[in-house]
From Swiss-Prot:
InterPro entries the UniProt entry points to: UPF0210
Annotated family: Belongs to the UPF0210 family.
Domain of life: Archaea
Name of the molecule in the record: UPF0210 protein MmarC6_1246
Length: 458
């Protein structure tokens, strides 16, 4: 039974505090689409995705209208393409194999445009231990794919807690990001490439979403967005102790999650597919007031990035998880607080005034999801340094048994003090400094960093 106060509170959240459903993401299994013939493979993929997702946008809009809750993005994720390309690429030269992978990516892009979704994820490879020949070709094809498509997102899982870190893949991904930055306008292609440790199979958020091998045939996963709501609550708690702040954030996260599950289940029911999970992540936008950094500042920090930031973020992240887990039994995905620099107005300001640096962001990723996200660095940054930044972040995820990721953008012709404007949800990225000292010899070693011991945890 809802009371009038709750209804008014929800209206305030939506109208004044930027509360919305960030995404309803349809995951589709493509394992049964594999075929030796490339044209048949593409046809199978088209038929499978459109049969489930043809009405996704229309259905989400209908549910949004029914409940008066904005659903900002409608997206699709698919089985990692690296898992279904083996028979298609057999016997092809490297160049032919790369072109075949890109053709599949173009098919995904065309499907996304036809059904009207914002992004389609799953141009992915899972190579935490070793890469198969087809996965190597898929990874090599990513830069070319980014020049040919608009809505396809790529991700590569290079590490897990159980497998360790594949340093060959880490090295390669630094090179892939660097190459992509040089051949796409303002390095925009890099905004659609994520490198993961412990990638979740049910993540609804881009650019790292894919439909994991352990998922069913089709499923709806929902992601909520409520930094503005949490900030409004925290601002009413001046002088209260941190335990009280945590409790109030928990209660707020409960309400946000309950709304996300309601909408996600309704969309799934209308489409005739299973409901998967609601992702508890607080996802910021460039809109003023819809910022994770501003929440931390409302807790009592002069600027996000100063001493105490990691502790405040740990409290926030844990409170959101506790409140969300109470609201739903179907929790998954990344489920934490996102700290993407270019997508968070408060983070952008913190970087611009010198309060927030790459090293502090790395420390913050130890206590939240999902990692170094939408970080713009000077275009002159060498591939080995990009690989080393990736390796550091993968190590944090591997040791701490959590998902970490890197989405980094070396912007050609830009240096510290400059910024690059992407618009929309991707926002504005100030160029952040990286170390001028080389990591090249370390990266050139290759090999695999072994999985960590599980009993001695200090």
């Amino acid at each position: 039974m809802y009371v009038p106060e709750e209804i008014i509170e929800t209206i305030k959240m939506i109208e004044y505090q930027n509360l919305d459903i960030r995404t309803t993401t349809l995951g589709v299994n493509l394992k049964d689409c594999a075929d030796k013939d490339l044209d048949l493979l593409k046809e199978n993929i088209y038929n499978k995705i459109t049969s489930y997702g043809g009405n996704l946008v229309e259905t989400a809009n209908k549910v949004s209208q029914k409940y008066g809750i904005p659903i900002v993005n409608k997206r699709i994720s698919v089985t990692p393409i690296g898992l279904i390309m083996g028979s298609t690429l057999k016997g092809l030269s490297d160049e032919e194999a790369i072109d075949a992978c890109v053709e599949v990516g173009i098919t995904l892009d065309n499907i996304a445009k036809e059904v009207g979704v914002d992004f389609i994820g799953g141009y992915s490879a899972l190579v935490q231990k070793r890469a198969t020949p087809e996965e190597k070709m898929l990874i090599r094809s990513i830069p070319k794919l980014m020049t040919k498509t608009d809505r396809v997102c790529a991700s590569v899982n290079v590490a897990t807690t159980k497998a360790g870190i594949n340093m060959y893949a880490v090295k390669k991904m630094g090179e892939i990001v660097k190459e992509t930055s040089e051949i796409t306008k303002d390095a925009i292609g890099c905004a659609k490439i994520v490198v993961f440790c412990n990638a979740p199979e049910d993540n609804p958020f881009m650019a790292g979403a894919f439909h994991g091998p352990g998922e069913g045939d089709a499923v709806i996963n929902a992601g909520v967005s409520g930094p503005g709501v949490v900030r409004a609550v925290v601002e009413q708690l001046k002088g209260k102790d941190i335990g009280t702040v945590s409790d109030e954030i928990k209660k707020t996260a409960f309400k946000i999650t309950r709304m996300g599950e309601l909408v996600g289940k309704e969309v799934a029911s209308e489409l005739g597919v299973d409901f998967g999970i609601v992702d508890l992540s607080l996802a910021p936008t460039p809109a003023i007031g819809d910022s994770i950094a501003n929440i931390l500042e409302a807790v009592g920090l002069e600027r996000c990035g100063t001493h105490g930031t990691t502790a405040a973020l740990a409290m926030l992240n844990d409170a959101v998880k506790k409140g969300g887990a109470m609201a739903s039994s179907n929790v998954g995905g990344l489920s934490g607080a996102f700290i993407p620099v270019s997508e968070d107005a408060g983070m952008i300001e913190a970087v611009e005034v010198g309060a927030l640096r790459l090293e502090k962001l790395e420390a913050m990723t130890c206590v939240c999801s999902v990692g170094l996200d939408m970080i713009a660095v000077p275009g002159k940054t060498p591939a080995s340094t990009l690989s080393a930044i990736i390796a550091d972040e993968m190590a944090i995820g591997m040791i701490n048994k959590k998902t970490t990721a890197v989405r980094i953008i070396p912007v050609p012709g830009k240096d510290v003090g400059d910024s690059v404007e992407y618009g929309g949800l991707l926002g504005t990225a100030p160029i952040m400094p990286v170390s001028e000292f080389s990591s090249e010899e370390f990266i050139e070693r290759g090999g695999r960093i072994p999985a960590p011991i599980q009993s001695l945890t200090n």
